Amino acid sequence: MTEAKGLRRFFSKFICGDADDSTIEYEPYVYIPANSYSYAEVTKITTKFNRVHGKGGFGVVYRGVLNKQQVAVKMLNRASVYNIVQFTKEVHDFVKVRHKNLVSLIGYCDDGEHLALLYEFVANGDLNDQLSGKFGNVLSWERRLKIIIGVAQGLEYLHSELRILHRYVKPTNILLDENFEAKLADFGLSRSSPTNPDTEASNKIYVKPGRDPYLDDQYFNSNWLTQTSDIYSFGIVMLEMITNQPVVDNNRESPHISKWVDLQVAKGDTLEIVDPRLNNDFEPTSVRKAMDIACSCAARAHNRPSMSQVVIELNECLALEKARSIGRTGEITQTQ
């Protein structure tokens, strides 16, 4: 089947319209073959862009419905994409990528002035929303570990298997599905920037100068991102997850979270800076080890571990926490 015929057949099955969510029975997400969509088709998917799901550095995200499945449609600002021809080529490459910790890219729109990406819809928002208490719940320590392990596995796959950078690792780009499985978003935009000709393609990316608290000093000195830059960003996200503190707070002794944590750890206050909403309901050894991992990721570039190492060590943290939970269950059973 040609792409055009496949596209027509695909769109003949659309369940899109002006109906309210309550009138639509959504089906569990399954992989939809990727295609190129026209702007008119994207307009239909999003019901004329009437439901804004969120806003990010690349553009506005809208909710839509495609074949009884919810999808997220990111309308991109063309100014944010360095090379449209290269971008289109890479989108074709990325629609083939399937990893449980990466948001699935369904397709794209490149129609006149309109540029968009279509993704699977992820139900539980992003990590930033969850940590902020927006939904009224507090993530347990075990759940936080599982989430950050998912992020680490997604980055490990990007670095080791695809040999590309993510470049935008931050809580707003870590989405959580109905089971709170972490899925990295926006990785498909990582290669739409010029690469350094002196390195392997995609292993080093030039980024316009600017201040971003998730990027390391190496970037600020050179404006080039490397795998260690992603690892630094990951470490900062981990520190946020552990402490539930903002990345930058000018009222702190040291405004940036990495420096602030270093100061507190030097004082011996490791557990004192853990998110108080956890109410000390965690295995201390697991938290301390996780803090060490986060700090090593945020250390100087040549001292940072690989994501493969991080995955191994984080699973050890999870094993420690699970052992505590099992032990506590045993104690309750004996008491009864």
Regions found by a protein language model. Give the residues of each.
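Conserved eukaryotic protein kinase-like
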Residues: T2-Q336
